[in-house]
Amino acid sequence: MGEIPPTDSGYPTPRDEIPSTSRPNSPNNAQLYPLTSTPIRGNKSRSMKENFATFRNDLSIIESTGSDTIENDSHFVLDGVKSLLEASKELKKKDRANSLLRDQNESLRGENESLREENCSLREESRRMDLVDKENVIPVIPRLVFDEKPDLDPITVKSSEQIKKELLSFIKNDEDRTIMEAKMENMLISDSKPPAKVFTATATIQVDTEKMDANIQTDKDDHVNVVNANLQIEVDQLHSEIEVIGKKKSDLENRLFDYEKLKAQFEQDENKLRADLEKKLKTSQEKLVKYEGKIEELQSRLNKKRKELEEVQAENRKLLEDKNTHDFELDEAKVQGEHLEKQRKEAWEKVEQLQEMLGELEAELDRQKELKLQLEKDMEDLRKEHEGQMAELEKRLEKVSEKEKEAIEQLEKIQKENKTIVKENVYLSESKQVLLESEINLKNELDEMAVKLRNSQHQVAGLNEKISEEKRRRKKQDADVTRLDEQNQKLLREAQDSAELLEEVQKGKREIDHLRQQLAHQSSEAGSVGQLQQKLAESEHREYLLQLELERVMKMERDLDGRIEGYIRSEAAANNELERLRKDTAEQKEKLEAMEMEARSKDLELADLTRKLAKAREEHETFEINARNQFYAVTGQMHEDIESYKQRLLELEPYPGKIISGSFRDFPSQTDPSPATTDAWMQTDVEEQLMVSPEVSLVSEAPSSLQDSRRSSHLDEKLRRTIEKIGELLAEHESFQESLRDPEFHTAEAFRKISQLLKSILSGANSEEMLERIWTWLTLKTKALVEQQDEQMKKVQKAGEMLLSQLREKESDNEVLTKKSLEMEAAAEEFRTYYNDMLTENDELRHRIVQLDEIREVESSNSTKIEKGLREQLEQAQHELEKKKREYMWKLQQKDEFYEIMDRNVKETEKENKRLLRKRTEDKERMDDFMLNIRKAQEQWKYLRMRNCQRHTSMMNMLESVKKKKHESRDMNWLLQRFEDSIRKYGVAELTTEEILEPEGSRSSSSRTLSNH
């Protein structure tokens, strides 16, 4: 320990002569410049950064090694700093964890503030009630707590993969998807990069100060400096972290902006795709219309070709009938056969084209199915929107319930205020009546709302009936579809029957061939020819029957087509009905919203009424408090004046046996003083009273001396002055008549000023006559003033009655409150009598006070009874409101269930429509297959008919030729041999089932053989 240098006085002294750069950097060299008692002046201007710039190397070494590399005696300081930094890191982690809780607390602050405001308002009301009446304890009405469920909004956090999926769901093109995925990956990689590291370090820091007085300073200064330095390091670290967080925030905002841009692009692309799809739909519909026109044209062409074929067949028959032109007709038949083959090929080519067109139509149908699926998705979106609207309606209902609760609370407040109204005045009793009327109006409005809800329920029931009718129609349509299936099965059976008929035809042809063989064997007999003709006729008849059967089948097909079209129309009508029902439901929703708006308007009107009531009550309370204070002050002043008069009069009794009483019973009465003639009456009366007469004076002998005359003149002057002052008082009384509310105030002021005048007179005079005159005059005047005050009280009562009549016009009467008002009026009359008797006798005044206390107790008991009755009424009203609310909620739940059932029914109808459409497509495909089979059968039938006709004509010609040549020929055997040869050449005798179904090429070869023959 060194000695203190003589230069150091212990006070702050400057040490700027040593530069900062020449000072040592380590604490080991601190002995060269010992500590002083105070910090050096020059270090105050230096920043912390300059002080700690020399310790960066040590800080980096400590951070890299994790241990103290500086070998000195301050290891415990470094350990303390390290522990502080670790504690700061833990505090930062806790702060991050607490930030989440702060976010949750912010949501609760608004609720707490609203609750605080409500508590403040309730406290103010309670204080006001305590000031109004501290004696009466108002019973607390229990608050009815409804079933409230707090809305808990859980914080939904989406991961990056979910956001990526949602963004990619908007994209449909593969190229855009790949670009978007690359951008998303880059952004996610940038998100996943580690944040910038903030290097922290701990070190023992030596503040660069001069140390001169080492013996005086202690080690605590070093410790404080170390702590301050560490705190500054932590502050720098926090600043760096704040900058990093700001950068991250800006990056996230930029990314959000990019996300929003991409989302907008996706929405634009989606809108474009929708527009393109709508255009394609329109073009496909136009193409369908064109294809239908083309199909009709092709059908007309086919009909024309059929007619042409029939004409050709007729011409062929004519040509075949001509015997002379048989060969020529055969050549034409060949040409026509070739032409028919060409037409057949062309027809097959057209059929192939039609098949291709049908394939295209099927592809378009597939596209329409896809569009239908998209429409179904849109329907699901609409359903979701409907559910969202229902949720909004539920929220609105919750708001309405909250408003009802507020209305109930307002009613409770109104009831509490009505208690004070019943105790104090009739005005507030009538305001209670207003509240009852408002409650009745609310009940009526609720009844009207219930009637509207019932009407809406009836409408919903009508809609349900319509839906049931639609279901019945759908069932009928299903039955018709089943009938169509049965008819299709019948058609298939008929096709089988037609095939069987064809087989029978083939059998008939075989029989004909057999008969021909028999004719070949029995050609010698002429009767066999007739049998052959009969059998041929029978076969023709069978062919005719088959043709009729085919025509019947064609008619059945046409009828089926018509029925299918009818079913399609019925389906369209059902869809229109569904759209109409949806529109009706939307209208009902709008009506419900309108009803909710009406309910809100009624709530607002009720709130306005309550505000007006509150204002009226406040005004009445202020008026009543002022009137009471004024009345009590006036009565107290009057009591003091009366007692002072009594004492003064008792003191002024100089004569024995002559006692002047202080009561007003011995005074003469005066009635009906008019306020208009008060001044003139006062002047004349005072002059009469001033004249001395032996009748009026109390003194038996007249004044004889000059002193008495002087006294009398002096008294006369004083009396004149008193008259003038009384006139001034009356003028003041008239001027303040409208300003003052309480009529008792004027009499008190008059008495007070008169007492002052009397004191002034009595102090300067000793005349008893003058006092007696003044006393008599004052008694008369006091009576007149009392009567004037009574008239003013009557005027005030009239004004109050006018106000009551105005309020009664607005509000209805209540029996209980009217009884209370009558009791209050009786109490007021008793109080008036008490006031008049108070001026007469002091004993009666005390007795009246006791009576008034008893009356007040009775009134308080009555008020408690009334409060109980009102409380019961309020509880009943609350119970009814709860019941109506529950009924309303139950009705809303029923409506929700009904809408859910409607949605289910709509979905079921859509499914049934889809099923019917599928059946329809399947039926169409079956009908198309059936028509193709029928056409093939018709072609085979036509071919067989033509071949049979040709053979029949050839046989008839041969028979005719045989008949003609029968007489000419000499040898019948030769003719029969020729007939058999011709039959063999034609190939009739050796026909089989395979030859019946031969193509036209073989037929042409057979026709050529006939022509060669």
Swiss-Prot record:
Query: What cellular component GO annotations does this protein have?
Result: centriole; cytoplasm
Q: Where is this region: Disordered?
A: 1-46, 457-485
Q: Where is the composition biased (Polar residues)?
A: 19-40
Q: Which UniProt keywords apply?
A: Cell cycle, Coiled coil, Cytoplasm, Cytoskeleton
Question: Which residue stretches, if any, does this entry annotate as coiled coil?
Answer: 235-525, 564-626, 867-926
For bias kind Basic and acidic residues, which ranges apply?
A: 466-485
Origin superkingdom: Eukaryota
Q: Where in the cell is it found?
A: Cytoplasm, Cytoskeleton, Microtubule organizing center, Centrosome, Centriole
Job description of the protein: Plays a role in centriole duplication in meiosis and mitosis. Required for daughter centrioles to acquire duplication competence and become mother centrioles, and for mother centrioles to maintain duplication competence. Regulates spd-2 centriolar localization and affects the recruitment and incorporation of downstream core components. Also required for the assembly of a peripheral centriole structure called the paddlewheel, for centriole elongation and for pericentriolar material assembly. Required to maintain pcmd-1 at the centrosome in early embryos.
Q: How does it assemble?
A: Interacts (via C-terminus) with spd-2.
Q: What is this protein called?
A: Spindle assembly abnormal protein 7
